[in-house]
């Protein structure tokens, strides 16, 4: 079953504070968080996606190849926005692999030049362009292809864009488990809730003594820089459902 965009918090062992805070922010524009949900339901009935909030603007971030990128680079395009940790052993590799499949579907649909995948590195203090490039390559993407921009910056820049701008929480958690157990830090936060465990060769090789816990969300940003959909289980979003939503933003049938 394909996942639909939702404002409901997923029962995931991840931080949900940013999206909860987002409901309060949106209350100013829609009257309340209930109003936002009602708008989503009305929109679904009308087969359109509501405007949720403006995506943040930024400049002088760096992509996986070390090139400077600003938010203006995506003007006039639909963006599929993700938040990824290069050494992740849970959701991020699954999300990346799914987005590669989605990009291939875009290409076969003739829409590749109208849509960009934009992801943000939620470990800006510990990893940089080299690790980001290796991560994309590990999960099937040609890192030189400009249709996927994996962005990083200083910790302050990324915190401003990701948490203040997109309302997505993340935090660094030091590993209190045994050496080499890169999932134990996340489990310390998650408790007994199950998480998918994915073998990430980059994480195995680096063996860093920490994890980054973050919200498992995917967002759609329209050609005018407005967030139009939030999927709160990014690793479960089907590529055909995502393509349908993208087509609606592009004014295409199908």
Please identify what each model-predicted range represents:
Residues 54-56, 74-78, 112-117, 127, ...:
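Extracytoplasmic
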Residues 46-84:
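Short extracytoplasmic
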Residues 175-254:
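Thiol-/selenol-based redox modules, centered on thioredoxin-like
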Residues 69-99, 117-118:
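Short active-site neighborhood of thiol/selenol oxidoreductases, capturing the structured segment around
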Residues 96-161:
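Structural microenvironment flanking redox-active thiols in thiol-disulfide oxidoreductases
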Residues 1-58, 62, 253-254:
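N-terminal targeting signals for export/organelle localization
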């Amino acid at each position: 079953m394909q996942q639909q965009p939702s404002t409901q918090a997923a029962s995931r062992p991840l931080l949900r504070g940013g999206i909860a805070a987002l409901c309060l922010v949106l209350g100013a524009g829609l009257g309340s968080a209930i109003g936002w949900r009602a708008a989503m339901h009305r929109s679904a009935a009308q087969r359109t996606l509501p405007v949720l909030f403006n995506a943040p603007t930024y400049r002088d971030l760096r992509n996986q190849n070390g090139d400077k990128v600003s938010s203006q680079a995506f003007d006039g395009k639909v963006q599929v926005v993700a938040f990824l940790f290069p050494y992740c052993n849970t959701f991020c590799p699954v999300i990346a692999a799914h987005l590669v499949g989605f990009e291939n579907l875009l290409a076969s649909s003739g829409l590749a030049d109208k849509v960009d995948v934009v992801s943000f590195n939620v470990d800006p203090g510990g990893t940089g362009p080299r690790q980001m490039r290796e991560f994309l390559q590990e999960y099937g993407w040609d890192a030189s292809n400009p249709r996927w921009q994996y962005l990083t910056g200083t910790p302050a820049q990324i915190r401003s864009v990701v948490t203040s701008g997109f309302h997505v929480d993340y935090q660094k958690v030091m590993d209190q488990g045994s050496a080499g157990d890169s999932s134990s830090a996340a489990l310390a936060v998650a408790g007994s809730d199950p998480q998918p465990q994915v073998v990430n060769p980059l994480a195995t090789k680096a063996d860093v003594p920490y994890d980054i816990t973050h919200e498992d969300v995917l967002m759609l940003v329209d050609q005018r820089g407005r967030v139009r959909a939030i999927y709160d289980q990014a690793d479960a979003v089907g590529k055909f459902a995502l393509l349908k939503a993208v087509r609606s933003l592009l004014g295409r049938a199908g």
